[in-house]
Amino acid sequence: MLTRNDGRAPEMGRPVTIETDFVRTADGSCLICTGNTKVICTASVEENVPPFLRGKGQGWVTAEYAMLPASTGHRKQRDGVKRDGRGVEISRLIGRSLRQAVDLTALGERTITLDCDVLQADGGTRTAAITGAMVALVCAVSKLLDEGKLLRSPITHQIAAISVGVVDDTPCVDLCYEEDSRAQVDMNIVMNEKGEFVELQGTGEGRSFTQAELNALLDMGAKGIRALMEKQKDSLAESKRHLSAKPTLVVASSNQHKIRELQHIFGDYYTVVSMVAAGFNAPIEETATTFAGNAAIKAETVSAATGLPTLADDSCLLYT
């Protein structure tokens, strides 16, 4: 029977913390710590797309992964012009995984780059990077919503990842470096909130493995990922961000003072935008004989044009 160095049971993951806004200059960021593995994840938004997507009306999510020189026991040379092959492969894995979280058309013609830099490596760096990058991505999207650059969130799925393996003939989850270096079977699992697999990377390092062992690893991984997703939600909630986007509420007005006032009132529950920010800038003929009637005409017109629930300015009548 395997005895793990830190006393964990085979099915138990390491302690996890996720600190949002770790890099204040980034559009979104977090520091994720899984045991002694520590990874900074940042998200940067650019208002353009790669050449192969220009004019197609959709955005792009990509990633870069690197390890700081002192992140392991021996100094790792920094990437130069020729990037480390392992780092390139992991960068592609992170990018593929996080694109599964986003409706690229709803993102619009902009690029979000997720940079994952390993401060300290003790196994599971790529899976920690994916889990942390999801949080950084949500933070960046929240900023775009707050700035009125997006009217609805393009986030469609929650993504997290964990490592599993067979060590001393025992299936276990969330391997540290010592366990990973002698694992007989090594696997990385990426899943969404529905329990669907986004990516599986698995190999028999020291021997082949059975269907029963594979099933045990998948079950352990799914349980571990569910716990990681709760950590993601908790860290985002602490900074008043949420994976499920706040609905958009349009105000039938261009009065910025009124918009700010309603954002202050409803901002915890709705993304409040002006009718111009929602794409409506046409004159409205107010033909009713009462204040409430004209407010209704204005709100109904804006709601019909934008397809979004609309709040009449001073009357606070709501139309959907």
Q: Regions from the language model: what does each represent?
A:
Residues C316:
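Catalytic metal-binding/acid-base residues of hydrolase active sites
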Residues A245-P309:
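N-terminal polybasic phosphate/anion-binding patch
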Residues C116, A312-D313:
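Active-site flanking residues adjacent to catalytic metal/cofactor-binding acidic residues
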Residues M1-S244:
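Polyanion-binding surfaces on beta-sheet-dominated domains and ring/shell assemblies
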Residues Y319-T320:
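Conserved small/polar residues in nucleotide/adenosyl-binding loops
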Residues R14, G57-G59, Q201, K258, ...:
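Alpha-helical protein-protein interaction elements
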Residues A106, K240, Y270-T271, T310:
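Secondary-structure boundary/capping signal
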Residues L31-C33, I40-T42, T62-E64, V250, ...:
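Short, conserved beta-strand segments within well-ordered enzyme catalytic domains
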